Amino acid sequence: MDLPTTVVRKYWTFANPNRILHQSVNQTFDVRQFVFDTARLVNCVDGDGKVLHLNKGWLCATIMQHGEASAGAKTQQGFMSIDITGDGELQEHLFVRGGIVFNKSVSSVVGSSGPNESALLTMISENGNLQVTYVRHYLKNHGESSSGGGGCGAASTASAVCVSSLGGSGGTRDGPSAEEQQRRRQEQRHEERRKKSSSSAGGGGGGGAGGGGGGGGSGGQHSSDSANGLLRDPRLMNRQKERRPPPSSENDGSPPLREAKRQKTTAQHEGHGGGGKNETEQQSGGAGGGGGGGSGRMSLPLDTSEAVAFLNYSSSSSAVSSSSNNHHHHHHHHNAVTDVAAGTDGALLLPIERGAVVSSPSSTSPSSLLSLPRPSSAHSAGETVQESEAAATAAAAGLMMMRRMRRAPAEAAEAPPQSEEENDSTTPVSNCRVPPNSQESAAPQPPRSPRFDDIIQSLTKMLNDCKEKRLCDLPLVSSRLLPETSGGTVVVNHSSVARTAAAVSAAGVGPPAAACPPLVTTGVVPSGSVAGVAPVAAAIETPAAPPRPVCEIKPYVVNPVVATAAAASNSSSSSSAPLPPPPPPSGGRRGRARNNTRGGGGGGGGRNSRRQAASSSSSSSRRSRRRNNRHEDEEDNDPLLRLSQVAGNGRRRGPSFLEDGLEIIDPSEEAAIAAASIAAFFDD
């Protein structure tokens, strides 16, 4: 026998709707409000229906979408509620929960409160029209009559709250119970999902209990599902929650996870005494027992349970142990302080005790210093602490000395020693900036080697002087053309040669300045060589050339008189007849054209050739005069050419890649300059 089914249909049509509010809180929460002039309602229950007209009023729609889509479904879960007023009174309030889809113009939700009940709510707002459609079907109660079903067909909510429920009809008890069951099923599914996704253990709180009215039931369900939807957010579900297990049964109250980490950390660094106990247990036992036998056990602090917590804890325990015997060895312990500076990477800063013997760094390592045994008795503990601190200071001193020897150059000379106070205050130990140490004011500075400190200071001074452009005071040899005497002799500047020789002799490279007499070099300087460099190098007789600029650009100037004299001196040794001076360039070009006769015989074209030669010589002389006038104007304005007029009339030449490029100083010359500079600093 088929059970009777009740179907409720409602169709709202609004005239002249105007949207006055549209607030989108986020991607899943949307509120829209409209005002209208008139409205018409078509209300149908099963086979009956009626029409209702309303005057001016407003409509408010709330759309909420939360959580993830259910398995096999393309829509997300949510709810939609619509409240309608007209003639100053509340006329309708609709609420449906289920799969929801909404956009700018259409919002629709389809829900099912159980296997025997389902509902549909749709709102369409486009082209100046606003329509709301609501359809719901459910099974009738056995005790419900047809009139009761008709009265219940005028229900206004999806939670089966009928209009007659306000009067206490029997059909009102069926709707809330089904809604409550549906809510409980959803909560159970949410709880299972939270457990599977490793969510928090106490996460799923039940929703509010549904009351007799539709507003109360919907409000409790709304709060429950909104919270469940927030927890079902995949971004929050993928995040690992912090587990907080109950504290262990031990008296320290620390969680078992931290206890296991502490035991693992302390087990890796075992001591060599105390009946097989590790160092951390002995230290904690000694501190807890007031310096006694160390039988009590004290756990690590909560803030030192990291992987390197044993470093900080060992250092603090050693400070506690040493402070317990402070009245016996106060005069020895006030200079050695062992602590960890705040903000460092966990390494121990071990200042060197004054008067400590520096040993080889290979004999003792910082890792072995941390695992030194400490006896349980008070007096023997103080002595062992003193021995371990002395070994630590010796190892640290050896490390510092090796670092300084690595930085100090082997060729630097020894500087006069300075006082220990000056070394402690001014000498940098490392190139990196060490973070400020809170124990620096109380801890004494370690003794340093005077020899290496002076070398470091000298090198630092040299680097600072290099930065300030006052590296050395060696004179630079000029690259200009040297003046020439009447006999073809080039005279070198005696003062510059003497200063250069004195500087090089001071550097220990060549002979002293007294062994260098005033130099006069007979001969000429070729046009393709650097003037003034080769004679100075030959006069000093050093394996390296005198200091010159790193790069120099030679001027585009040649000396034709010097070149002619060089050619004359070379030809005088081979033949008695001197060579004629070279013809001008224009005459040379015309001469080549004149020698190339076009006729076959020489006698027939003699006159023509002489006329051509005369005309060409006259025209070339006119052009050369104009060119010379232009050259004279350029030479008057060129200071470089005026300098070259001392040796004769100069002229410009074209650039040459072989002679006019950048000249690079040899590495040996740079080494000589550096050696002279270092020697000058040490002589000061």
Curated annotation (Swiss-Prot):
InterPro entries tied to this protein: U79_P34
Modifications after synthesis and translation: The isoforms p34, p43, p50 and p84 are cleaved by host calpain-1/CAPN1 and calpain-2/CAPN2 to generate p20, p26 and p28.
Biological process (GO), any one: bidirectional double-stranded viral DNA replication
Chain intervals for the UniProt region annotation (Disordered): 166-301, 317-336, 357-393, 407-452, 569-658
Ranges of compositional bias, category Basic and acidic residues: 180-191, 232-245, 258-272
Composition-biased stretches (Basic residues): 326-335
Position of sequence motif Nuclear localization signal: 261-264
Biological role stated in the UniProt entry: Promotes efficient viral DNA replication. Recruits the DNA polymerase processivity factor to pre-replication foci.
Oligomeric form and interacting partners: Isoforms p34, p43, p50 and p84 self-interact and interact with each other via a shared N-terminal region; these interactions play an important role in their intranuclear targeting and in the recruitment of UL44 to subnuclear sites for viral replication.
Protein name in UniProt: Early phosphoprotein p84
Species name: Human cytomegalovirus (strain AD169) (HHV-5)
Gene: UL112/UL113
